[in-house]
Amino acid sequence: MNLSALPALRLVAALIAVAASGAAFGQAKCGLNTGKAAAGEPIMIGAVVGKTGPDDFSASAQAAAAYFKCVNANGGINGRPVEYIVADDQWNPETAAQVASKLVKDRKVVVLAGNTSFVECGANAKMYADEGVMVIAGTGVPRECFFAKNYVPINSGPRISATIAAMYAAKTYQSKRMVCIIPNIPSLGNWGCEGAKAWGKANGVEVETIAIDPGSADATSTMLQAAAKKPDTIIMHMPKGLLVPMMAAAEQQGMGKKIHFVSSAPAYNADVPKAIGPYWNKNFAVNLEFNPLSAAGPDNKNWQAVLDQFGAKSDPRDTFSQAGYVAARLVTETLLKMDPKKIDRASVSDALRKVSDFRSDILCKPFYVGSGNRHNANNSGPMAIVDGNGFANVPGGCVTADDPELVDVRADELKLGLK
């Protein structure tokens, strides 16, 4: 990998990062809930993550590992324990291809779950399809993660998140002219803003994109460039490291008094409200890819309990973790419906493609896999607004993205009888 790309990759890693913690709620519930350890023949499940390199991007797999430990302590998959093998791609496409090949061709995993990587989608999607193995990924970021037949991200992705933020601004502020600011990173860049732009074109809202160099962007110049376009709303589509100085520059120019500011999911970070300061109190709305980390739903509470009882104290309790938990639960519940003696890659892939109504209160809508050529089942999310040193949910709950790029996804949903 080109080392000169590492600073940008660090920023990409933060692009969807959030930080929050949760307390344990009761006893963790997993799988059969028998309280007896599984002792049969192991079922091999893998994951590819970017653990070492620019940043540690492995929280989804850590949560999945905790869930599978809980499953193994509660009867396993009808008596068979899960052997969960996590491989580090080191943020290197060549390494990603090598470690995935070992998992699929040497270790003979029947499925991968909890993947979180910025490089493996492009490196491995064809191999996964050729080998007939499914990936129920925790978090997808680059475009390639959402355009592969055998790769199924649990999260909604950056394009959907920005589109929902734009829809919120148009409805709440009656905005007719917006600017979307995003780092010019390959496979993310303009694509991350194009959903908002396409939705705007169909709904009488003009959306322009400003793509910035994440390594050399000047906050004041960028905000003045955005203001010069005379927008009603500015969509911030960047990691915290870029966001905070940009918001400070906007405050210095008094832009928050005449322009509305919204953001995609990266701003849903526990540190952001305090970092940007009181000027933005109740004046900065952000999209969430899942329901809030502090939500009181039983599955969200169980995610926290699983991490507390079967994970490490150092395991993040963030949205990456939520995604990994959901991925592991979906795979587990699919396997539990199968004859444990007949579990192999082909039968597992077939069973996963038949998933059409998986429910979790962490998600806004039932999740599905299906047989489509690509996957973006999670395309809804709520909005929150900065409130003091935290966030408050805004009325309206989950919003479904009206992105024209989802036309094929909507067709797949109709085939499955989903609305």
What feature does the model see in each segment?
Residues 309-321, 332-395:
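Segments of small-molecule ligand-sensing domains
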Residues 151-214, 233, 311, 322:
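An alpha-beta-alpha
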Residues 250-325, 397-399, 412-418:
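Extracellular/periplasmic periplasmic-binding protein-like sensory domains
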Residues 103-116, 136-138, 178-182, 230-240, ...:
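Periplasmic-binding protein-like
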Residues 128-131, 192-291:
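Extracellular/periplasmic bilobed ligand-binding domains
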Residues 31-65, 87-94, 116-117, 181-191, ...:
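Extracytoplasmic "Venus flytrap"
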Residues 28-34, 56-62, 74-145, 154, ...:
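Beta-alpha junction/loop-to-helix N-cap segments that form part of ligand/metal-binding clefts
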Residues 31, 96, 154-178, 190, ...:
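Hydrophobic alpha-helical segments within soluble ligand-binding/sensing domains
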